[in-house]
Amino acid sequence: KEKFLKNTPAIARLRKDVLNAVEVKGFLRGIDGRVLSIRSPHSALNTLIQSAGALIVKQATIFLHEKIKQENLDCNMVAHIHDEMQLQVKEDIAEYVGQKAVQSIQATQSFFNFRCELDGEYKVGNNWADTH
C-alpha cells in the first residue's frame, strides 16, 4: 500500500485530505452536498467515491428518462444495476437511445460541477449477456 501511495502522490494527498476532513468534522460531504456518515476512517475515501458514482448514475438516469419522455421514444427501462442501465428499445432507435444515454452521463459533469470528464458507452443486443 505504501509503495502504491508513493507512486501516486495525488491519491495519497486525496486520502490524507479525506482522513483529515473526517477527523475534523466527523463526516464528509457528497458531491450533492449531503452529509456522508463515516463508520470507519479507513473506509472514508471509498464512501466518498461510491457516493459520487451512485449520484452520477442516478442523475444520468433522470436525464435520460426526461429525454425519452420529451421525445416520446418507444422504450422502457427494465433494469438499473449499480452503474448500468438496461433498456428495452425498438431496434430502429436503439443506436439513437444509446447515444442519448451516453449524453445523459456526460451532462452530469456540469450538473455536479465535476472536474473529471464523465463518459459512458452503450451496447445493443438481444439480451443482458449481449449488452453487459
Please place each PLM-identified region on the residue numbering.
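Conserved catalytic core of nucleotide polymerization and phosphodiester-bond processing enzymes
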Residues: 1-132
